[in-house]
Structures are given as C-alpha cells and as structure tokens.
Swiss-Prot record:
A GO biological-process term: carbohydrate metabolic process
Membership in a protein family: Belongs to the LamB/PxpA family.
Keywords, in A-Z order: ATP-binding, Hydrolase, Nucleotide-binding
Taxonomy, superkingdom: Bacteria
The protein's name: 5-oxoprolinase subunit A
PANTHER family referenced in this protein's UniProt entry, alphabetically: 5-OXOPROLINASE SUBUNIT A, UNCHARACTERIZED PROTEIN YBGL-RELATED
EC number: 3.5.2.9
Major enzyme class: hydrolase
Subunit structure: Forms a complex composed of PxpA, PxpB and PxpC.
Function: Catalyzes the cleavage of 5-oxoproline to form L-glutamate coupled to the hydrolysis of ATP to ADP and inorganic phosphate.
Entry GO MF terms: 5-oxoprolinase (ATP-hydrolyzing) activity; ATP binding
InterPro entries according to UniProt: Glyco_hydro/deAcase_b/a-brl, LamB/YcsF/PxpA-like
Amino acid sequence: MRIDLNSDLGESYGSWIMGNDEQILPMVSSANIACGFHAGDPLGIFKTLKQAAKLGVTVGAHVSYPDLAGFGRRNMQLSYDELLTDVMYQISALQGLAKAAGTTVKYVKPHGALYNTIATDLQQAQAVLDAIKCLDSDLILVGLAGSPLITFAQQNGLNVVAEAFADRAYNADGSLVSRRLAGAVLHDPDFVAKRVVKMIQEGGVISIDGHFTPISAQSICLHGDTDGALSMAAAIRNALLTEGIEIRSFCEVN
C-alpha cells in the first residue's frame, strides 16, 4: 500500500513569510508550488524549487485565479480565454524556473477557489484542462476525489490523480466543508493522523454530520501554513510508516 503526500509551498511574498517550506519539504513526496497569482514571488519560488530538486520531491504548478489580495480564495467569473491564458501563463512561468532549478513540473493542482470551482463547474474546468493540454498533455491534473472533475478530465484525455485533505472536514457528499464554518479545519495532529490512516485503509472518512463518506484518493494534502503544521505533518508521516504505508509520489510508476 502506498500514498502520495503533497503540500502547498512557495507561497511567501517578499518580507511576508508563509508556511514552513524548508521543514515541510522533507516530509512530503510532492510539492504544489505557487505560481505568483495567489502568492509567491520569483525568488522564493525558485528557492523552494531548488530545495525540492535537491530532495527529489516531485514538483507541480499550483495555479490560481489572479487574486493576490484574497490569496486565491475568492471566486471569479473569468471568460474562457482569460482563464485559459492565466493558467498557461502560470504553468509556463513555473516550468522556466523549475528548469533553472534543476527539476521539472510534472503536474498541475489548482488552488483555493479555482480548485473548488472547477470540481463541479465544468465550463471553467474546460479552460483549465485546455491550458494544460496546450502546454503539455503529459502533465497530470490533481483534483478533488469523487468530484465530477475527475471523470471530466479523464474524458478530455488527461491523466488525473484524485486528492483528499488530511486536515479538512468533509460533507456527506464528499465535498469540503466551507472554511467559513466552524470545524472546517482540523487541528489535532493525533486525530488527523489516525483519520488519514483510516481514510487509506478503509476508503473513506466520517463526515462532519457523522456519516461514513467514501473517498478514493491517490494523494493526501498536508497544509504547511496552518497552526501546528509541522507537528501535524510529522504525526501523519509517522502514522503512515508505522502502518507500513509507503510514501511515494504518484509520478513514480514502480
């Protein structure tokens, strides 16, 4: 049994420090690197890419709506052409920096509001999928496990990885509980670690209203910017290894 662990990184902006990239990177197998539209400046992104290359961590483009002020968490109604070119721009920028850092962008994972929107809004999803195909159809799309996006992306000819979240509460339908609601983000490292192990072994989680919700995921997201992120990441990693669950990037075939 194996699982990929990913985290959102490269999100610091100038003197504003976000997350703990240097400490989180050794604990994960994949890194979702900001592309400058919701967070991240070129120097910080480049430093994170170089560390990922040094550690052999797989790199992905964490693309977003153009929303620095809102950290990419505000919904936007962009035209097809706007969203298409915004996503192409971000992927291309990260590909260039990654090449200079000695690594390669292997996948695309949308961020924040864009991630949640295209999970069900297939019109916006089409723009994101087309952006990926225009640049490199071998890029893998990471999306919310159980969402309509997974099948839609496969129908569009893309390789897809279904993702679950370690520290987010789920609704009974498999969607994420809104961050605006109490209990949406989980903070107890031991509870979260046990929950992740059960999610992998039993194929689901207990939703916020107490029902078992099936979730089939190949990657688990660990947020590196929450309170206690380091202790939570360590607890999850240790729990997986203790249970004999191998931590490997989904890009590794064997």
